[in-house]
Design a protein with these regions (language model features):
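Residues on a specific face of well-ordered alpha-helices
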Residues: 5-8, 49, 53, 57, ...
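Gly/Pro-rich interdomain helix-loop hinge
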Residues: 130-198
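Short glycine/serine- and small hydrophobic-enriched flexible loop segments
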Residues: 57-64, 80, 84-88, 107-108, ...
Length: 200
């Protein structure tokens, strides 16, 4: 539904193919209006990419060293909404209720991310976008499963918060996330990587 930019002070600029994050108090909005009607015409590819960007925001906020209880609750709510409503939205793109739920999920994850900043998945995403043309949300979510696996091993307590939001345990968090991504046909959005014929 969006990138969460309506509720944070972050932006991106491109310079000769390089992508940079910028931040400033003047980028923070004074008023936010969420109108799901504006999302009804979004194509499936953009719907999926922005939703996975929001999901990445929520995951990264939870395992972020700057996390706090409020961030946790916002992120949990966002994860639950995305898990439930993204598949429904893909099948019923003009359904206003589903669009509203996805927009709210993006908004909540955006607030969480604005308090913690992003983490490794976003950092890795930049070259994936600049070198191979992956859309931002697809690039961010490409490494979610692997980073989840690392967090389960090294910080199981934080990982369990994500697992509970996904309706699973730490033991099957990676497979649960993979199943969710397969359900929304995630592989179909990886064509730029496949075309690049990357072997390692």
């Amino acid at each position: 539904s969006g990138t969460g930019s309506e509720i944070n002070s972050w932006g991106t600029v491109w310079n000769n193919g390089d992508k940079y994050s910028i931040s400033g108090k003047d980028l923070m909005p004074k008023t936010v209006i969420l109108d799901a009607n504006l999302c009804k015409s979004m194509p499936t590819s953009l719907t999926v990419s922005t939703a996975l960007d929001a999901l990445s925001h929520a995951f990264e906020a939870i395992w972020n060293k700057n996390h706090n209880p409020i961030v946790d609750e916002l992120s949990i709510a966002a994860i639950k909404k995305i898990k439930k409503y993204l598949p429904l939205t893909i099948k019923n793109k003009s359904n206003l209720k589903y669009r509203k739920e996805m927009q709210l999920a993006s908004f909540l994850a955006g607030i969480a991310m604005s308090k913690t900043k992003t983490a490794i998945c976003h950092s890795i995403s930049y070259p994936l976008t600049s070198l191979y043309g992956l859309s931002h949300g697809i690039a961010c979510s490409l490494t979610l499963s692997e980073v989840c696996k690392l967090n389960v091993k090294h910080n199981p307590q934080r990982a369990s918060i994500i697992s509970q939001a996904m309706g699973c345990t730490n033991m099957n968090l990676e497979s649960s996330l993979t199943k969710f991504l397969m359900n929304i046909k995630y592989g179909s959005y990886l064509k730029p990587i496949k075309d690049a014929n990357i072997n390692n």
